[in-house]
Structure formats: C-alpha cells, structure tokens
Amino acid sequence: MEVSPLQPVNENMQVNKTKKNEEAKKRLSIERIYQKKTQLEHILLRPDTYIGSVESVTQQMWVYDEDIGINYREVTFVPGLYKIFDEILVNAADNKQRDPKMSCIRVTIDPENNLISIWNNGKGIPVVEHKVEKMYVPALIFGQLLTSSNYDDEEKKVTGGRNGYGAKLCNIFSTKFTVETASREYKKMFKQTWMDNMGRAGEMELKPFNGEDYTCITFHPDLSKFKMQSLDKDIVALMVRRAYDIAGSTKDVKVFLNGNKLPVKGFRSYVDLYLKDKVDETGNPLKIIHEQVNHRWEVCLTMSEKGFQQISFVNSIATSKGGRHVDYVADQIVAKLVDVVKKKNKGGVAVKAHQVKNHMWIFVNALIENPTFDSQTKENMTLQVKSFGSTCQLSEKFIKAAIGCGIVESILNWVKFKAQVQLNKKCSAVKHNRIKGIPKLDDANDAGGRNSTECTLILTEGDSAKTLAVSGLGVVGRDKYGVFPLRGKILNVREASHKQIMENAEINNIIKIVGLQYKKNYEDEDSLKTLRYGKIMIMTDQDQDGSHIKGLLINFIHHNWPSLLRHRFLEEFITPIVKVSKNKQEMAFYSLPEFEEWKSSTPNHKKWKVKYYKGLGTSTSKEAKEYFADMKRHRIQFKYSGPEDDAAISLAFSKKQIDDRKEWLTHFMEDRRQRKLLGLPEDYLYGQTTTYLTYNDFINKELILFSNSDNERSIPSMVDGLKPGQRKVLFTCFKRNDKREVKVAQLAGSVAEMSSYHHGEMSLMMTIINLAQNFVGSNNLNLLQPIGQFGTRLHGGKDSASPRYIFTMLSPLARLLFPPKDDHTLKFLYDDNQRVEPEWYIPIIPMVLINGAEGIGTGWSCKIPNFDVREVVNNIRLLMDGEEPLPMLPSYKNFKGTIEELAPNQYVISGEVAILNSTTIEISELPIRTWTQTYKEQVLEPMLNGTEKTPPLITDYREYHTDTTVKFVVKMTEEKLAEAERVGLHKVFKLQTSLTCNSMVLFDHVGCLKKYDTVLDILRDFFELRLKYYGLRKEWLLGMLGAESAKLNNQARFILEKIDGKIIIENKPKKELIKVLIQRGYDSDPVKAWKEAQQKVPDEEENEESDNEKEADKSDSVADSGPTFNYLLDMPLWYLTKEKKDELCKLRNEKEQELETLKRKSPSDLWKEDLAAFIEELEAVEAKEKQDEQIGLPGKGGKAKGKKTQMAEVLPSPCGKRVIPRVTVEMKAEAEKKIKKKIKSENTEGSPQEDGMEVEGLKQRLEKKQKREPGTKTKKQTTLPFKPIKKAKKRNPWSDSESDISSDESNFNVPPREKEPRRAAAKTKFTVDLDSDEDFSDADEKTRDEDFVPSDTSPQKAETSPKHTNKEPKPQKSTPSVSDFDADDAKDNVPPSPSSPVADFPAVTETIKPVSKKNVTVKKTAAKSQSSTSTTGAKKRAAPKGAKKDPDLDSDVSKKPNPPKPKGRRKRKPSTSDDSDSNFEKMISKAVTSKKPKGESDDFHLDLDLAVASRAKSGRTKKPIKYLEESDEDDLF
C-alpha cells in the first residue's frame, strides 16, 4: 500500500506535541514536590503521625465480648479509630481530676447509626468568650488546632491530656462532631456541631442554664478515612473494654454503657474480670495480691504462666505496652522474689531477675504528674521515676503475700524443668555399642549390644584397683565385664547443686557408660534393655572410706532411679581384710570381728602367719585371679527388702535428717559400749556364708562405721583435746624422744611408720605444723616447737614454709602436760597387730580448753574457743580444794583486743582502734582469726578504692605491721571520720566479730559423743576423770615401787649374805641353788612377778631390760610358773665390792623412803606437784620467748639508738585516743533472741559471724567503768571477776573463734608470768576470731610490750620524763598473791586521793603471785583515802634472773609496772596502765581484786615499803604490753 505524502508530517506533529507535554510536567513537578499544607490538611493527609495507622491490623488484644467477658483474642481493628474514641474517653476521665465531685460517665456506642457519645457530669467547660482569640472557649478547644489547657508545664497535673490534639483529632476524623457543655458557673449551655472533618462549623447555640454541669461529645467517625463500612464487632469489643478500663481505673465514678451500669467496683474488682475462671498448675484459682499503696498507686499481682503480663493505667490511659511505672513496681517485687528463690533453690540452675519476672502478672493503676509517652498513641509511658510526683513503696505484707501466692513455686518448677532439660542433654536416648571420650574406661565387648543386660560394669576405687580388676578379668573374660576407675568419692547428689551435678565428670561418665537417662523409670525388663550394662559392681577397699564410696553410689542410684535398686542392679566385690596361713593352709577373713572371733576360738592362733590387707593395692595379680575365680564368694548382691531400705538410705544422706542421724549414731555408740562391757564381739556383715546384703543392713552395720569414724577423726576427745591424727603425732614424738630438732617431713614419715597412719602424708605434715603454730589466734600452748617458718597471723598460718625446710621437736612443756608416769594407766590401741597410740592421753590440764577445738563430723560438729592456761590451772586447784570454779572467758595468747560476753555462750570480740587526730586513726589489733593480709584486701582496699555500690571512705592507709603485731594508720576526711565515730569505728572498720559456743561436742572418756552446755561442765568432767587416774597412777606406782623395793632388798641381802659366807654358789647345780634361795626366804623376781600380775604386756618404754636379762629370762623360764632368780644370780662379781655393796644398800633405803613418801600422798598432792612443775617450766619458757622477742628491740644489747625510731613505728602511737568498743542494747537483744531461738542446723553449720556490731559511746563506757552491772562479763587481762556471771551469747556451732583468757586471776594460786612495766596505755582487748580451723594450739604465751595503746583518759601524759626509766630497781623479793576474792571487793575499793603517796608513785603494777592452796594477806599501799580491800596473798617469789631492762619498752621486771585498772564488767582485755593520777588510783584500788594480767611479772608486787620508797621517782611510764594470743589450727583435713 502506498503511503500518503501527508503521513510523515502528522507523525512529526505528534512527536513534538508529546515532548511539549513532558516539559510542562517537569515544570509542574517542582511545585508538586515542595508543597505547603495547612495543619488540617496535613492531619488528613498523614493521619499515622497523629492517631496511628488508618489501615486494618490484626493482633492479640484484651477485648470485652458479651458472652465471654474480658478475654485475650485476635482482633482486626483500625488503631486510628480506636485512638480517637480513646481520646474523648480519657478526656472524660480526666475531668474527675479537675472536679472530684464528678460521679458518672455515660458511653453510648451505636454501630447501626455509626454514632458514639460520651457524657460526664464533671465541671463543664467555661462558656465564656476568650478575650484574645475572640471566640467561646468550647469552640476554641474543640474546633481550633493547637489549643489546650495542658500547656502549662509548671502546673503538676495528673491527667491524660497532654499535647492539645486529642479532641480535635476526633473532630477531624468525623463526618459530624457535636460538643454540648453546660456551666453552672457561667449560667450558660453551649452546643456546636462541626461537619466534613472539621471543615465546616455549624451555628453555635447558647442557652441560659441553671442545672448541674455536664459535657457531652457525640461524633460520627468518618469510616471512609478508615477504609471501613461500619463499626464492626471487633472495634466495638475493644471500645467496650475501654469503658470497663475507665470504670476500674477511675475511682468513685459509675460508668454506664448504652444505658447499663457496668458491674465494676474499683480496681480490685476490675482485676477479677481478667482472672475469672483462671487456675494454677494444681487446679486452684489464682491468688490475687492487692494493695492500695496510697491515693495515687494501686497494685495487684498474681502468677502468670505465659511470660510477663501487665495491665496498667496512667491517668486512665491504658498503657498496653507498659512503661517505667510498671518497671518501677515490678522491679521491687522481682528483687524480693529473687532472694527467696535463691534461698529455696540453693544449688539449682541460676535464676536471673528477668526469669522471675516472666512468672508475674501485674496490674498497676497510677496517677503520674505530667506523664510523657513515646508517641501520641500513649501505649508506653517514658517519664523517669524521679519525676512521677509520688512513690510506690510496697509494704512487707504485700511482699510476704507475693512470696506465698504461687509465683515462687512456679519459678521453682520451671527451674526443675530447665535443670532436667540440661541434664537430659548429658544423657543419650539411644544405646551405643561404642563410647568415645572416656579414656580410662575398659568397656565390656558386649556392652550396648544384644546381650547388654548380662554385662557388669566394675567401678573401682582408683587406678590401682582397676589394675587388680583387669588382672581378674583374665579369669572371667572381657566380653561381659567392663571396668571404670573412680577418682575418690563421688558427689552426694541428694544435696548437690545443679551446677555441681552438671559439672561433675565422674557422675556424667557413669551415666554415659551405663546409658542411664534422668527421670526414666526402669520398672520393667524392657526398660532395662535400653541400658548398656545390666549391673554395676562396686569394688572398693574394705575400709571405712571404701564403705562411704559404696554408700554414695547407692545414694546416687537411689536418688535418681530408685526402681533400679529393686532389680538387684547393684552389687559389691569384697576382698579379704586379713589372711592367715600355716603350712599350706590359708584362711581369709572379710571383717575384723570375724577374725577376732577366730582368734579367740583358736588356741594356737599365734602359730599362724597373719597378713593385713589395707586396700585393694595390697593384693597381688595372682590373688586377683583367685578372687575372680571364686566369684560366688566375693560377689555380694544388694537386695531391696522394702521401704525400710529407702528410709535407711535417706537417713544416711539426706540433709533434712540431721537429728535422726544423731540419734542413729548415738544408738550405735551406746550399743557398741554395751557390747564391750558385756564382752560381746562386734557385729559384722561378711561371714563365710554371706551372698547378699540388704541396703538397710549395709547402712546400719557398715556405713555407720564410716560415719562414726568420721566423727572420731573430726571431733576431739574431752580427755586430751586431741584428734587421732594429732594423737599419733604426739605418740611418735614421745616414743622418739628426740633431743635434737627433726624435719617436719621426716617426722611425718616416722609417724606413719610408728603409729600406722593410713592417710596422706601431706595432711599429716599439716597436722604437725598446726600443733607447732603459736601466732595470735592459733595455739595457747603449742605442744611442738616451731623451728622455722610455721606461719604467722599475716596469712593465718597459710604462709608456712615447705615441710622439707622446717624443723620441730617436742616442747619442753609437753612431757610435763602428759607425764610418762601416766602411760601405764592408758589403754593402748593395736593396728595391724602393732601397738600404736592410746585411746587418749590424760594431760594434767584439759588441753581441749587451752587450745580450743573445732571440727565437723557426721551429725555433729564441735567448736570450743581457747582459754587461758593459768585460769584453767587455778580452777583445777579450786576444785581440788572443794570450791566452785570461777567463770572463764575465752582468751587467746598475746591478743590485745577485748572479749565481752553478750549472753550465755555468746561473745563479742573487738580489735583495737585509736584516734590520732581529726583525720587519722590507728588500728593496732584485729579480731581473732581476722588475718592481717585478708583484712587489708577485703576491708581497707575496698574502702580506699570504693566498689560499684559504695564510694571510697578513706583517703590512704599505711602499714607498719610485723609478723606478730598489727598496725594500720588510716587517713580519711574530717567529715567521714566524724560520721564513722558516730556509727562506731569498730563497726565501720569491721573490728568486731562474734563468737558463739553452742556446739561444745566432744568424745567422753568412754568414746561416746557428749554435748556440753558450758565450759565449766567440761572442766568438771575432766577433773573427776583426772583425779581418778591420779589414784590409778598412785596405785600403779605403789605396786611398782614395792616390787622394786623388794627386789633391791633381796639383792642387798643376797650380797651381804654372800660376803658373810652364808650363801655359797660356787660349783653348785642350778636347781640346788634355787632351792637354797627359796629356803632362805628370797622372793622370785618381784618386779617380773608384779608385771605379770598386772596382766599387761610390758610397755616398750618400761621394759628396758638388757639383752643379757632377756637371754637369761629365756633360758630361765622353763615353766611359766617357776621361780625366777636371775635378778640375783646375774649380778656381776664387782657387786661384792664394798663400794657397790654400800651403793646397793643406799639405793634400797632410798627406794623404801620413796615408797613411804608416796604412801603418805593423796592423788591431789600428786596433781598439785605436777601443776607446780608445769607452771614453773611455763614461766621459764615464756621468759625465754620474751627474751627472744626482745632481740633487736631498742634498748637491748646496748645498740638501741640506731633502731629506736625504726622500731617505734611498729608500736601503737603513744598519743592516740583509744576507742572503747561498745556493746549496744541491740546486740544484746539479738543475742538473747538467738538463745531463745533454737539454731536449726546446730550440728552442721556455723552461725555467721556478726561483724560490725555497734558499740556504746566513749562517755557512757567511761562512766560504766566505775560501776558495772554485776551480771556482765568482759575480758580484761588485768582482772578477772569472781562473781557469778551471766552466760555468754551463743556462737555459731561451727564457728571457729577461739580466744584465750588472760590469765592470772586474783584467785590464782599459780605464779603469774613475768610482766614488764608498761607505758601509759589504754586498755586493749581480746578479740576472738571466728573461724579457726584447727583444734589445737600449743603456742606458749608471749608477752609483748610494744603493742599497747595509751589510754584515752590521759594522752598528754603518755610519756613522762625519761629520767628514771633506765634505772632498774632491784628485783623485788616478794609479791603478794591475791586469791579467793569476790567480785564485790571491786566495789569496795575507793581510789586514793591524788595527794596520796601512791598517786605519785611511778607506774607500779601489782603482780599477784599465787601459791597453791595458800591464802596469805596482801600488803596494800597505805594511801590516805584508800578504803580497805580484801587481802589475800601467797608466797612471794624472787624475780627471775637475767631479765634485761628496756628503757623504752618496759620489757622487764626491773621496771615498775603500773597497777592494774579497776575491774569492770566481765571482759577480757590486755592490761594497761595510765600515768594519770586518777587512773593510777583506780588501779591501786582495784589491784587486789583484779586478776593479774597474763604475762605480768611475778616480781612486781605492790608492797607498802616499795611503794613508799619509790614514789619520789618520776619514772617514765612504759609502753603497754601486747599479748598475742594463738588459736589452734589443726584439722585442715
């Protein structure tokens, strides 16, 4: 077809036209891109900025349905429409805040006519013209944008309206919007209607009005803007729920919906709408906890099973997403619940705060000032808590109810579930033929296969036992037997934490190897087929620890899979304990009682060779094969016999059955004691015919032996205060009787060899080290000497050197405390047929009180503090004299703090602190067992650097300690020091701890556990037993001396008759000779006869006969009954010489005299002799210790000057003002409360230390000094009250604090230790520390002069002119001793007037020098105004020689010490003295009644002549002496 010539022209025209249009569009787009809209247009164009989305959304919401009520379901609604309705509704509710008289809101929702109306009878809107805007106020605020009454932020409002948009937005999104309001105040009614999205305003109607105010908003939502046809069911259900919200959250307002009143009476009944028909896991209705906290806050709480849920309102706005108001309340509840859950879930899965919150459903209704939200939709309140304008502190009642409403149980169930999930991850649900990752497992070849039920897993005690089992598998084969070694004891899963179980490799390995699954029930045979092994065989040593391992494995299976025990799933493999052989005969015994029975029924048992098997490692591979070849004899099955088996297993391992366990063990001990008395053999399990065992029998006959031995190892004996390990050490040292020091490591080897010690040598070395320690807080009397670094108070003994480098030997006091003469009266034990240590030693004083004791066994624990040696000795003397013993306070050697009694068996221990100036304090003593380094790290460092929770308190501290003394100089600001003083420096700096002695449990002399209520009960028990044993000793000595005397008499007569020729022995037959001797009336060897009569194997020590004698005995004793005259016929010829004859006669006469002397003595006399010898040696030892301490101190050895300043820095400052620790009423009340309240776990756990107790003010304390209540006790080193004292506060049964009482009492009949003159100083106190780990300390007491703090009463006089300090007065010849004083005497002493000669007398300390059993008058200083004091005294004793003077440090006798301070309430303190007249007078007046402080020199006696003679001298007062106390640390193992 041809193309018309016009065609191209048209096409070109069209192209040009298109180009022009595109260019026009480009020009227009600039204007379109950058447009300006009015606010009304903007709201309609972008509604989501103002009212939220105008699109339909579907989500889960709380709605109200007619047939169901409030429920949580999926709804489809338009958020924008919901919001405009809500704005009008909240405005109506806000009106209640403006007008409290408002009482009604009427809501009408008419879906058919698309009409919503909200009416309230609150105060109407002012119907008045706005002078600025020139229009009526209702028209202004409903028809003009950006208008509001809420723009004044200075005004605190609790309304929902905030930004001035709400009602206008409703107007804009409505086709018709009518406001009608009436104001009685302005007497007008206003009505106006807007149409077309607020685009067109109708005529305003104004009418006169005289009725009640009201406001009514009626609107027709513009459904087209929300893409809706009508108000559907879902949006109506949501709006109805909001009407209910308003009814619940607005107080005292009735809400009507469509003419019907809503059945809601306040917030609590509103909450019920949500929880109606809701039940917890057990089917019970949910408990609701409600509290009206105040007029602005109302809270309800219940349990939630769907995570954290909250329904909350802020000023009637439903904050569906919560906000800070919800967090504020929820966090308070969570914090309390977390604590409760942690307590109840000890050891379970760790629970965090958000996990606790997930179990809570909280309802909050709050009025908050000027709240802020994160959007105009107001779903999340963002205002900070500090701006709320009110607080919501939930009451204790609410919290208590919250704990009991089911939330805690729900959390704990969730914890168990989570734990189970975690545990199940450790198990395999599928049976595997091969297991990887357990290298030490020798798997049975058939394990995990078809025949797995026939397989047995042998669990052995350690690798060596595995080797034995593997040797035996050569006999039975490897197809059906697997072997896995256990590393020691497995966990007690019944009491273990979830974390422990999860991380315990041993348990996880057993589960993996056997194929066990948690929570699976293995009732039937099919379930057993899912396991890799059908049985577990336990193969442990036949000792008590082996029994414990068996018990723990039984407990493990029983706790998790009790059904397995019914299938005979467990069995044990037993091996012999003893084998006897003769020729080719061999017998094996599987229990010692069975062996003993065999011995008693076999007359010639000594001809058999006996071999003891200590563990599986003793058996050879050959023997292992023999055992496995006779599997029937060695395999013992555990048989389930019923509920009594379950009960027995729980009894042994459940924490809840502590009391039952005590009863169980007590019954066992009583039964064993009765059997011994009746001569019956012990019960045993493994006889020749035993093939099975019930769990009940195993627990009650085998495992109980472990529990009992655990107690024996952990709890010392009342008699000697020692545990078996310590007794073995002492036995070995006595036997070795080393004259030279020996290495600790070597001694440990020796102990293991000589005393048959079967445990690790490391623990033995620690026992030796602990027996030798003598730092403050360890031993008061160390039985071994610490030669080398045995540990110090810096680290609590943990800084001891390696046992390879340190040496020890017996203390010179040891054999005086444990006299060899008593050894014959003791019952020695036998182990492996070897004679080892005795059942107990019998010291001359109760060592359990001197060095304290501590240990935790099964069912019981023991905690006894240290007491002062001299106080104990004095009390023993009182008991011997038939008098009542004096009360004692704990005392630790060389401790300078105080120990005060709070209540019976409860004490408070305080360190020492002094104020140097307004910004500096000095800490010169820490509570007992608060170690210097620990204190620095845990108290001072956090105070210096601050922690996350606490700001720094101090600005700096300096350290001036030595290994024996403490000195921290602490700097802080004036304000903080003043505040700390107000609170109490001891409390702030944690210088007070508490000591409770409520678990004084010890083995008595018959081996039964006994709980003592007081220390004096222990003392009386010991006294009776010891006196009885002195009687036994006398009896034995009389027999022995009689026999020796007869022997010497016979020998002397024989020699004399031979010389006279009356007897001829030359060339005569032996038989004839014996006949002649009998005829002439000679006795058969009297000593030998006497020993045989004792029916004792002669002790190795006493049987030191020469080899010749032994040989002679052998040849002589043809018949046991024949007479023995070797003692005569074996005498050497040179006995016939004159010299030897005379010597023999002299010996005979001396022995006879010795015998006569002994006969005249009573057991008490023997005891007193021992005590006197011991005290004398104690003085010498302490003098030497003091001398050693003084080496290098200024003033010693003539080279003092260079070191003087350097040494002074370690001593307490002389100008410090001592802070007296206070015991507050609260502390006493707390102590009383503890007494009334039985401590639940009295037997297993220690009560916490009470640190930081508040103390009384200094002033009150000083006033009290003069006049104390008679009932209270306080420990002072200078005095010891003698009146009856209140019992002291309980200390935690397991707590360790021990303190050693300062000792020389005025009642003491023991020569006091030497004491040096002191510098004016304040009283120092004894502090007891709470956790000493060991039971012994034998440190000798040392006196220290360097550590006293001057008394706060006269700091300015702390140093007087040094003129006379260096002059050493002659040793005083005599010292009065004070004895038998009543506490009341203290009150009678009136201080002398300042003018009295005594007052001018330079510090002279009266030393009380007691002498046993004698009361002598004390010479008192004749001060003019001094009242008479009771005078009692003792023999005077000369000062020890060689004491050196120390001008600066009052080190010696030569200085005149100040008199002790007056006795106050019973308190253990180091003695101190003041130069000030007043204090001096007080001391003088008190001197007689007060006990002499520990360490006080025997040579300082206040004597009239001396006092007068020296008063002219103004000697410089000495620095106070510090007493370092030691506490025992022995049972770390």
Swiss-Prot record:
GO biological process, one term: positive regulation of apoptotic process
InterPro entries: DNA_Topoisomerase_II, DTHCT, HATPase_C_sf, Ribosomal_Su5_D2-typ_SF, Ribsml_uS5_D2-typ_fold_subgr, Topo_IIA, Topo_IIA-like_dom_sf, Topo_IIA_A/C_ab
Subcellular location: Cytoplasm; Nucleus, Nucleoplasm; Nucleus; Nucleus, Nucleolus
Modification after translation (UniProt): Phosphorylation has no effect on catalytic activity. However, phosphorylation at Ser-1106 by CSNK1D/CK1 promotes DNA cleavable complex formation.
Region (Disordered): 1-22, 1090-1121, 1183-1215, 1231-1533
Binding sites annotated in the UniProt record for Mg(2+) 1: 461, 541
Subunit record text: Homodimer. Interacts with COPS5. Interacts with RECQL5; this stimulates DNA decatenation. Interacts with SETMAR; stimulates the topoisomerase activity. Interacts with DHX9; this interaction occurs in a E2 enzyme UBE2I- and RNA-dependent manner, negatively regulates DHX9-mediated double-stranded DNA and RNA duplex helicase activity and stimulates TOP2A-mediated supercoiled DNA relaxation activity. Interacts with HNRNPU (via C-terminus); this interaction protects the topoisomerase TOP2A from degradation and positively regulates the relaxation of supercoiled DNA in a RNA-dependent manner.
Protein name: DNA topoisomerase 2-alpha
Gene: TOP2A
